[in-house]
Amino acid sequence: MATSSSAWLIFSDHYPEILIAIACFLIFSLLLSARSSSEDSLPYNWPIFGMLPAIISNSQFNDFTTARLRKMGWTFIFKGPWLLDMDYIFTCDPSNINHMFNDNFENYPKGELGKVFDIFGNNIFNADGDLWHDHRKMAQTILWDGNYRTMQATFIRNKMDNALIPILDSAASKRKPVDLQDVFFRFTFDTSCFSVLAADPESLTMEFPAVPFSKAADQALDAALTRHITPRLIWKLKRFFNVGSERTLAVAWKVIDSYIYDKIAELKAKRKLVGKINSYDAVSFYMDNFNIHDDKFLRDNAFTYLLAQRNTQSLTMAWLFYALFENPKVELKILSELKSIVDESSERRFNDGFALFDSNMIQSAIYLHATLCEALRIYPPVPFEIKDAHKADVLPSGHKVRAGEKILFSPYAMARMKGIWGDDCLEFKPERWITGNGTLKHEPAYKFFAFSAGPRICLGKELSFTQMKMVVATIIYNFHLQMVKGHVVEQSNSILMDMKHGLMVQVRKRSVM
């Protein structure tokens, strides 16, 4: 035995390249096998590696997961590498989601997963228990305040008038393609900064300037995804040694903090100079209504508000237009509805020949609202979320959950299940959201999960719908957009469902008045 060991050591010392080649061959074979596994079967559960190679080797995580969930009856056990605490329960079963977010809500807190998103700090996103309840009450006061909503609507209208329409008009005149996803990212970044920090960064201009904050925020979310698929010990070691994705996160964190803290300081300096001002941005609201002036508290909540508004609205609108490119009859129905609204409205808002839709005009846009719902159903901005169990539990599907075990649930997959949304689940069909009486149809939040469900359901849901309808209506009524021929739309493998290559479009003015 000793002789055999000595021979192995001599071999490894003199021929390391052969050992490396063997290791590479084994890894390549393992990945190739994982990639070639049938969509009708679970990922192969390898010794040591578990099912992780199948995930790593697949470029479309959401579609990969959907296929397995469809085959396995909406729930299956994902086995991670040995000894690394990476086993998950994957599910898209509405009864399981209702159980976690409603019936047994207290057993599925943010808990350890809050540490994955530590860049958000100690706010409504990461908080649990009494602290979360306090955060939610304050957020509700802000988001439901009439002055706050009026300020938001006015700024959005002005931003459409002074930035969005001129940029699209210029693109039409010059016949120059524009990345619509980037336009929406910039638009919502400007509007969210104003609503949160009373500042307009003016990122949506003809020059399309670099936006360090937005880039840093995207990098931070990518790092969070890396943490999700990396053993906790590994990403904590990477953070300790400041390498890889953790180094990227640290740099991005500094950019984010610098921007938000600077804006908070500017707002405080202005208030000190002129006294209390009638500003209804979120940060001013915390200071005026709740007497909270702590910079760290204000920073944490500002960052959450900024990302919530910027990402969800921009991605929803981008995917909506992509769906319209694939379903032009839907666009014609929206246009017909908008023409009727303009004809009947006593508040026609035109500027240089362009119609602007305000929050009052779009209240009766039922078909447009249904189209947004359908876009959110098929293309949820957050395609999957993760929970972990505080105590052992049994899901309605019959699957046992260990204390501390993680559950990944997929709204993206849920939208693609015939047993949940019907045989036409893959069709983009706004009509599914309209009743026989012509009113909007309600679906339970655990089935239509775009705004979360249960006690944590999004407080800004209706406000978000109103803002998106204003923007989408204004674009569709004034312009006809077409996707650039040959442009490929592909999902990024990310926590958010953004378009990897953007959404390049040609713009043409529309004559509808």
Curated annotation (Swiss-Prot):
Cofactor section: heme
Protein's job: Cytochrome P450 that catalyzes an intramolecular para-para' C-C phenol coupling of 4'-O-methylnorbelladine in alkaloids biosynthesis, including haemanthamine- and crinamine-type alkaloids, promising anticancer agents. Catalyzes the formation of (10bR,4aS)-noroxomaritidine and (10bS,4aR)-noroxomaritidine from 4'-O-methylnorbelladine.
A GO molecular-function descriptor: heme binding
Subcellular location: Membrane
GO BP: any one term: lipid metabolic process
EC identifiers of the protein: 1.14.19.50
Top EC class of this enzyme: oxidoreductase
Name of the protein in its database record: Noroxomaritidine synthase 3
InterPro entries tied to this protein: Cyt_P450 (IPR001128), Cyt_P450_CS (IPR017972), Cyt_P450_E_grp-I (IPR002401), Cyt_P450_sf (IPR036396)
Residues reported to bind heme: C458
Keywords for this protein: Alkaloid metabolism, Heme, Iron, Membrane, Metal-binding, Monooxygenase, Oxidoreductase, Transmembrane, Transmembrane helix
Transmembrane segments: 14-34
Topological category with respect to the lipid bilayer: Single-pass membrane protein
Main location class: membrane
Keyword Oxidoreductase carried by entry: yes
Organism the protein comes from: Narcissus aff. pseudonarcissus MK-2014
Pathway: Alkaloid biosynthesis
Family that this chain belongs to: Belongs to the cytochrome P450 family.
Cellular compartments per GO CC: membrane
Origin: domain of life: Eukaryota
Catalytic activity: 4'-O-methylnorbelladine + reduced [NADPH--hemoprotein reductase] + O2 = (10bR,4aS)-noroxomaritidine + oxidized [NADPH--hemoprotein reductase] + 2 H2O + H(+); 4'-O-methylnorbelladine + reduced [NADPH--hemoprotein reductase] + O2 = (10bS,4aR)-noroxomaritidine + oxidized [NADPH--hemoprotein reductase] + 2 H2O + H(+)
